[in-house]
């Protein structure tokens, strides 16, 4: 059985650990989004837009609806991804203003983790559309079923 002081000490240690872990995860996710995912998405968007342009020249009467739909979906997703990346970056910067551990933990839970969930949702959606050779990370199938 813990004394009140021991219990409070454990509480503070666990709270501090939670804050550090979520902060590290958020910064890691932000770096992955900015340095790996967004450049890969832009590269794929460029490829699809060049494909659409080539089809217009080579086959002006051809149905380009599939390519144009992919281009539109990727472009819209990339825009939303870019915005939430900026929001996450801004929200991470605001963490330094939180000095009370419980206030910081609640901010991380209510703001940062929500930003991360939205960023993840958008990244997963774009991953579903992009061919594996464009995506910078292995997909779930590669991770689960690859033999090392």
Where do the PLM segments sit?
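C-terminal amphipathic alpha-helical interaction region
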Residues: 1-148
């Amino acid at each position: 059985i813990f004394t009140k002081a021991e219990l409070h000490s454990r509480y503070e240690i666990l709270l501090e650990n939670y804050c550090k872990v979520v902060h590290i995860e958020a910064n890691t996710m932000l770096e992955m989004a900015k340095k790996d995912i967004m450049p890969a998405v832009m590269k794929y968007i460029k490829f699809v837009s060049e494909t659409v342009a080539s089809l217009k020249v080579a086959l002006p009467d051809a149905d380009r609806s599939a390519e144009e739909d992919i281009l539109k979906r990727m472009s819209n997703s990339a825009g939303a991804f870019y915005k939430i990346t900026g929001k996450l970056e801004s929200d991470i910067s605001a963490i330094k203003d939180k000095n009370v551990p419980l206030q910081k933990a609640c901010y991380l839970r209510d703001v940062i983790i929500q930003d991360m969930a939205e960023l993840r949702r958008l990244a997963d959606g774009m991953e579903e559309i992009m061919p594996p050779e464009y995506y910078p990370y292995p997909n779930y199938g590669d991770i689960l079923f690859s033999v090392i």
